[in-house]
């Protein structure tokens, strides 16, 4: 890149843990691609701040899920967005990168783009799955979209939005053949015997809704498969405290409750019961049979159902274009149904071999050196705006 008389300034906003992961990966690529004097600032989490990012607000202020649940947080979120917009318009960065969080970022990006600031959005919203009307917002707000999945650029380019498929950083990070033995040693689990990882979500509201159902399902599974062990990773210390009463309420369960280490827990497992989200892709990259589930409040569920297009919600099924693992959602997510489906995934060796092949192909398709590709695309956007 040509010499810069003043340091480049790149503003970024990530709104939840998955965005923090993507942001940290992208920052690693930007540090290698852009001049060493470049500054990176905005809103991010601990992973981003660990790689020379100046967080003006903590990411947790934006990490609110669902329509109804977000209502009480709207005033503070709008205040933060207004303050950030004023800052960025007063001192324009060389580029703005919104990382996921479309409900927060698109309005901000539209205002910045209108002022001539280049806008990049990292993670295409699921316009192919639901809320397809957001393509109109993307056209107004985004100069360039960085896409995690290979089918997305074509959809965007048809609407006139420049886009680059960059792959997924998890596919770069996770080995093609995960080390189950090492993961079990790390967790103090025996090398033999069935292990099921149970992941009821990374937010308090998710765990409160589905956690009791998951633990009731675990109790049923242990009755039917007496040698089974469970490992439940809690994303934060606060969530561990929330999960501990569920463990205490099932004293006969053979369960290991860990803090963090979700990937280690899934690597150690023979099968996974998981709440829908990015973690389902992680489970697929680890080549694990799984059952995907979620429960949301009734009104949120009704809104989502009316705006949905695809018959599935789990990323492994979306990427495969068909059901390759079962999904049990809302009122279908009973302890009995979850236990039956998870034990089937645990015991069916032929299905395990089939899934290993499907998930290996998926892994190879998404392994694209995401940090470098994304950073190169950002550098091109910045370079295209400089006077030549």
From Swiss-Prot:
Catalyzed chemical reaction(s): a lipid X + a UDP-2-N,3-O-bis[(3R)-3-hydroxyacyl]-alpha-D-glucosamine = a lipid A disaccharide + UDP + H(+)
Gene Ontology CC annotation, any one: membrane
Alphabetically ordered keywords of this record: Glycosyltransferase, Lipid A biosynthesis, Lipid biosynthesis, Lipid metabolism, Transferase
Chain coiled-coil ranges: none
Biological process terms in GO annotation: lipid A biosynthetic process
Family: Belongs to the LpxB family.
Listed NCBIfam families: lpxB (TIGR00215)
Function: Condensation of UDP-2,3-diacylglucosamine and 2,3-diacylglucosamine-1-phosphate to form lipid A disaccharide, a precursor of lipid A, a phosphorylated glycolipid that anchors the lipopolysaccharide to the outer membrane of the cell.
Protein name: Lipid-A-disaccharide synthase
